């Protein structure tokens, strides 16, 4: 369907949201499905927002205090993370302030056709009953975002464990980043947040980018998800590497012994072995490109 839309609307900016399946599930061919899907999306769209079921479920339990999250709870958590990216927002301030549309955001976040995977981190995230009592300062929200980015996780709980634990944060390198501030005093706080990030080098960018710290920033005075202040970081960088490594390793193990290929080549008849080879080559090259951001 996405390929058809790309054919019908060649000038449009196309963006997809892909949800990575659980690491262990009852669907034995999930790694094949993810491989084929992501490799096709890379050639058809301008950007792909990646979410993981495991991370969303952990957010439900650790941050929203839902002991037994349902599918609706998990979907709501993902939706609340992507919502600040899609809602109207502005760039600049004063008379230079202008509306920032999604196509502009994607152009900044994905300036190279080989780098299209986008990661979203959002704070705060609390239990529903605590939302109206949450009044984090902009500096506190920025610290949360920095810890989450350094740890490569969308969960504040996991970021805190790495911060105070024995394991050193991975400190992933980005190609580009978009920081979104929404709520009370967002426009006034934007420049201070960017200055703080640049001075601390808390969010790293590839050495070959124009300034070495390729940020875009958007603001909106309106609340989102009920919070007086909230902050979202969209990054295009190495946080995707662990997932791609795991996906390619599992899919390669199955492909090497020919496991379940008949379900695609014989039963459905729409795919051939060469299609798998092309997908491995495409996603493998993408993984290598993201790894090279840090070199």
Locate predicted features:
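Terminal, contiguous helix-loop blocks that mediate binding/assembly
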Residues: 1-295
């Amino acid at each position: 369907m996405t390929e058809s839309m790309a054919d019908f609307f060649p000038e449009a900016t196309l963006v997809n949201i892909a949800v990575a399946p659980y690491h262990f599930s009852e669907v034995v061919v999930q790694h094949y499905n993810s491989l084929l899907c992501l490799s096709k999306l890379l050639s058809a769209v301008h950007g792909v927002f990646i979410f993981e079921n495991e991370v969303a479920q952990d957010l439900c339990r650790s941050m929203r205090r839902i002991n037994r999250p349902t599918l609706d709870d998990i979907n709501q958590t993902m939706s609340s993370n992507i919502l600040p990216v899609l809602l109207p927002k502005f760039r600049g301030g004063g008379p230079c302030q202008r509306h920032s549309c999604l196509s502009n955001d994607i152009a900044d976040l994905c300036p190279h056709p080989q780098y299209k995977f986008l990661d979203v981190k959002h704070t705060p995230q609390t239990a529903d009953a605590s939302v109206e009592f949450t009044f984090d300062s902009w500096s506190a929200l920025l610290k949360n975002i920095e810890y989450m980015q350094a740890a490569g996780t969308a969960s504040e709980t996991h970021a805190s464990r790495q911060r105070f634990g024995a394991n050193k944060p991975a400190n992933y390198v980005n190609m580009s980043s978009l920081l979104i501030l929404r709520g009370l005093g967002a426009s006034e706080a934007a420049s201070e947040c960017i200055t703080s990030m640049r001075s601390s080098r808390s969010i790293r960018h590839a050495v070959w980018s124009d300034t070495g710290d390729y940020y875009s920033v958007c603001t909106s005075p309106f609340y989102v998800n009920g919070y007086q202040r909230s902050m979202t970081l969209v990054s295009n960088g190495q946080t995707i590497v662990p997932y791609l490594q795991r996906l390619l390793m599992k899919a390669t193990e199955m492909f090497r012994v020919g496991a379940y290929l008949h379900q695609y080549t014989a039963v459905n008849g729409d795919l051939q072995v060469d299609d798998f080879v092309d997908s491995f080559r495409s996603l493998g090259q993408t993984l290598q490109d993201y790894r090279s951001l840090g070199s």
